[in-house]
Amino acid sequence: MLIAHSIADLRSALASRGRPAFVPTMGNLHEGHLSLVRQARTLGDVTVASIFVNRLQFLPHEDFDSYPRTWEADRAQLEVAGCDILFAPREADLYPQAQTFKVQPDPLLADLLEGHFRPGFFTGVCTVVMKLFSAVFGTTGGGTALFGKKDYQQLMVIRRMVEQFALPVDIVAGDTCRAPDGLALSSRNGYLGPAERTKAVELARALRTLSDAALSRPVADWPGLEAAASDALRGQGWQPDYLVVRRRADLQRPDTAPRPGTLVALGAARLGSTRLIDNFEF
């Protein structure tokens, strides 16, 4: 596996290698990331992963400084998974100057749910993804990028960005990987203490219960179902930000009874000091 730190070195490594399949990450890798890398190997001529903890998508009070950096383990896992090129830029490589130009996503999609509770988050995400796409695909004529469904709203925002800017990038979604008890794998699960880890699956169960209830009740009842789901989770010791049911297409609440297979239940809640997100399509 070749490791490139600068954009120039990355582009040199990609020269004459064909179409890349690219998996962007912030490191601290788990099976969800590695499954995307393995899938990428079937979708391009050369498999590229990146590790970069992007300061722009963290709010001032969030965990940028404490976010786990596990370079040696990540590098070894990527090599075993079959990654051809690891792009690991330093901050000065990706942001050599203050990033005064930013990508502002559509507020109808990016200012609700995660965007409401983490203002500016998706601006930071879109800006770094645009820079990464430029680095990886800028001299290759396009390719494929893979993102996990666990970060559902992020996936949708990036898809919309690619459409709006007519980028020559195919976005492929990977299914959420889960622990045997049903907890969605996440780099932030490592923050959980033993007792919290046992309880953490309660978020997934709450979303399953909410999705089942939504299918059996009219749309007019959904706000009450969502409030009850949040109250139940709060009673189990969580601090919920939201538990909602939305259309997959645009993350809005339907006006009329939707067809099964077009909806997603999404949730975000804090257990102790750890904020977890999850979702279920149904």
From Swiss-Prot:
Its main location: cytoplasm. One of its GO terms (cellular component) is cytosol. (R)-pantoate binds at Q57, Q154. It catalyses: (R)-pantoate + beta-alanine + ATP = (R)-pantothenate + AMP + diphosphate + H(+). It is found in: Cytoplasm. Transmembrane segments: none annotated. Its EC number is 6.3.2.1. The keyword Nucleotide-binding applies. It is an enzyme of class 6 (ligase). GO terms for biological process: pantothenate biosynthetic process. One of its GO terms (molecular function) is ATP binding. The keyword Cytoplasm applies. PANTHER family: CYTIDYLATE KINASE/PANTOATE-BETA-ALANINE LIGASE (PTHR21299), PANTOATE--BETA-ALANINE LIGASE (PTHR21299:SF1). Catalyzes the condensation of pantoate with beta-alanine in an ATP-dependent reaction via a pantoyl-adenylate intermediate. Homodimer. The reaction proceeds by a bi uni uni bi ping pong mechanism. This is Pantothenate synthetase. It comes from Paracidovorax citrulli (strain AAC00-1) (Acidovorax citrulli). The gene is panC.
